[in-house]
A protein has these predicted regions:
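Sequence/fold signature of self-assembling virion shell proteins
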Residues: 24-131
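Extended, solvent-exposed, turn-rich assembly/linker loops in the middle of proteins
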Residues: 1-36
Length: 131
């Protein structure tokens, strides 16, 4: 949020953590006298909630060991269309077939499209290793 110069549209609204830490914050109570989990406490008491935005925390198996020195990673990012995009993958398809007399064969060309996540503004995503 600081890197986006405190613009509310740059405040992270999604957090991904490894499943073991997620299970811990879901099952562990805030205190012995508490009646809510750590996850519920975080979701109800955070800066995003105070500013009228909803924070979502999800488990992600790819966060396990993804950090430096095989430590677990946390990813905080803004999940909005203007900030994060992905190209829609297109199935592999046959685009052209032609006979080849010398090889006594048909040569067929195939084409497809794969996509990757595109971060449009790097101020809206952060990684934290070793959680």
């Amino acid at each position: 949020w600081e890197d986006s110069e405190y613009d509310l549209t740059g405040m992270a609204n999604h957090i991904l953590i490894d499943p073991s830490n997620y299970a811990y914050i879901v099952t562990r109570k805030v205190s012995e006298a508490g009646n809510i989990s750590i996850l519920q406490y975080i979701l109800e008491n955070n800066i995003a909630k105070n500013q009228g935005r909803d924070l979502m925390i999800y488990p992600c198996r790819w966060c396990t060991g993804a950090g430096a020195s095989d430590k677990n990673r946390m990813v905080a990012y803004v999940n909005e269309k203007e900030k994060v995009r992905i190209d829609i993958p297109v199935m592999l398809g046959r685009v052209m077939t032609q006979p080849d007399v010398q090889q006594m064969a048909y040569l067929t060309a195939y084409a497809g499209q794969i996509g990757q996540v595109k971060i449009m503004y790097y101020e809206t995503i952060r990684y934290k290793d070793g959680i």
